[in-house]
Swiss-Prot record:
It comes from Oryza sativa subsp. japonica. It is found in: Nucleus. The function of the small subunit is not yet clear. The gene is POLD2. It is an enzyme of class 2 (transferase). It catalyses: DNA(n) + a 2'-deoxyribonucleoside 5'-triphosphate = DNA(n+1) + diphosphate. The keyword Transferase applies. GO terms for cellular component: delta DNA polymerase complex. Keywords: DNA replication, DNA-directed DNA polymerase, Nucleotidyltransferase, Nucleus, Transferase. This is DNA polymerase delta small subunit.
Amino acid sequence: MERKQAEYSNLDERYAIQGEKYQGQQYSHIYFTRLHHMRNLLHALVPSWKPHLPVTTVLGLEEGKDCIIVGTLYKHMKLKPSILDEYSKERSAIPLVKPHNFMHPDDHLILEDESGRVTLAGAIPPAAYVTGVVIALHGKETSAGNFLVEDILEAGIPPQITLPSINEDKYVVFVSGLSIGSEKFNPLQFQLLIDHITGHLGDENEQSIASNIVRVVVAGNSVHISPRFFNGQAVASKDQSRIAEPIKELDIMLTQLVASLPVDMMPGSNDPANFSLPQQPLHRCLFAGAATYNTFSSCSNPHQFELDSVRFIGTSGQNIDDLYKYSDAKDKLEFVERTLRWRHLAPTAPNSLGCYPYTDKDPFLVESCPHVYFVGNQDKYETQLLQGLEKQKVRLICIPRFCDSGVAVMLNLRNLECSTLSFSTSFDA
């Protein structure tokens, strides 16, 4: 079987932290950098939005006078967990909440810039926003000292490079949430996926389609290591081999894939990688078999790359899962879309999502619109072709956990159309 090829460029340099020096700095730098960058963008958009209104700072607000302010949102949440609550004697007074969402009707938004902060009221729904988003607001200060919002300006979907014209079918397969080592993991199910991709399964037609698969992206949470091994105690020698077993099994299965085609390996929240974003590539020494092939690429999370000039950006899901905890939307795709409109992959970092304390940049800013934006480890498969005001076209993909669904996602580079690969090993009648 002759496999098609695609020209690949890894664009993960901006997420590398090897050159960074940690000197005890806090997170104010990353917020300042974000505000400075986004404010310049929003100021450039104001003349075409509300050219007759003055732009002022929070400190420069005057009661009853219409104006525009630009700043970073802070969402005051009654139910948001606090480290102080862990040690509070009055802990029982705090209402119990479901761990998946911390929203409350009394939540309110505050806008902050270098000069000060002001509580927001009016036409801005707290449920739709999170801490860390930079926006412009039209409104006026009230006698109570609040800012009454009348209209909102977001940065919007960023500019996009032209989508190349590809005349033949070439596919990228996305899979996430393998959870090798967990009770849910079904090795036969994953082996069926591998056999299908490598062309060892199916009739001539299916093998012909498989030969058009040019790359596989594994979007995080590939292994599951029992938390009981990480209780602060020294790991017994007999348990050390058990910890390594899921990684060894993953390596054996990856080796089958990389022997046939290129594979990008992204870390996730459950993988043996650093906790905070951007997660650095999994060390190649973990993959004794797969790493011997030049088709194996260990990548960061977030991961950005180009295939035949089609630009991809994606995460292993932590950024969208965190938005789900602190805001509301009709589905996960709406959260994904919001991060594009806010031009920021992870607005809740570093407030509620761990990230590295950069001093001179915010690597999660989205300066160029991708053609494909994927998010791993979601509850179900969802996709949408999003169109921007400047004719941008973005394929949004929520990749389901494979251990739960047996579903991988296949994208055609020619037209950005998506389909699923579903595998089941159930023998029920």
